[in-house]
Amino acid sequence: MPDTQLIPESPVAVEPAPAPAARKRPKPGERRVQILHTLAEMLQQPGAERITTAALAARLEVSEAALYRHFASKAQMFEGLIEFIEQSVFTLVNQIGEREPAGTGQAAKIVAMLLHFAEKNPGMTRVMVGDALVFENERLQQRMNQFFDKIESTLKQSLRGALDGAGSATPGLDAQVRASMLTAFAVGRLQRFARSGFKRPPSEHLEASLARML
């Protein structure tokens, strides 16, 4: 789980007292973040089975009803994780676009960023490749499909300018083929990472792999 947004509430030290102090109740926004953080932590356990709201509530030491005060359904919880993935990744994509000129170098940095993001967030990786969504609402998988479609489109746009300058007779087609190949490579690396129990890092031999493709 990343340490940028989904950070659990820090415990507050209290002085010993004759009577036990009441547990501090998190604010609504803090509780939502705590729920998502815990869900992502549970997803990153190798071999984790389908996560139920009962198991999530037990981990948080709250009732299932308490979860539903913050999310209408478990699908909405997964949507919260997907939103975090989308916002994090495409914010970084935009930063790369501002720093790097369009071309193969920019495309390589986008792919590397995506794989490093997944490597640092194993629980999110299971959402990205769909393993965690198998038994959930179909729209969640559709949304992740759209995420990778957008990644592919971004890579195509990045590569198109370089191919135009290189004198390609079919720059649009060539850019599409390369973008599709890079996206398939990235998805394959994420799937291997998840299905190896997070033992095979997606960034393994990354520079050499990208050099062969670009």
PLM region spans:
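Hydrophobic/aromatic-rich alpha-helical bundle segments in the mid-to-C-terminal region
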Residues: D3, T125-G130, Q141, N145, ...
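Short helix-capping/turn signature of helix-turn-helix
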Residues: F71, G130-E136
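Short hydrophobic/aromatic patch on the recognition helix
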Residues: E61-F71
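Ser/Thr-centered, proline-biased regulatory motifs
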Residues: E49-A55
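Alpha-helical structural segments
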Residues: E30-E41, Q45, R59, Q76-R99, ...
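N-terminal intrinsically disordered/low-complexity leader segments
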Residues: M1-E30, L163-G167
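Helix-turn-helix DNA-binding module
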Residues: A57-A58, E138
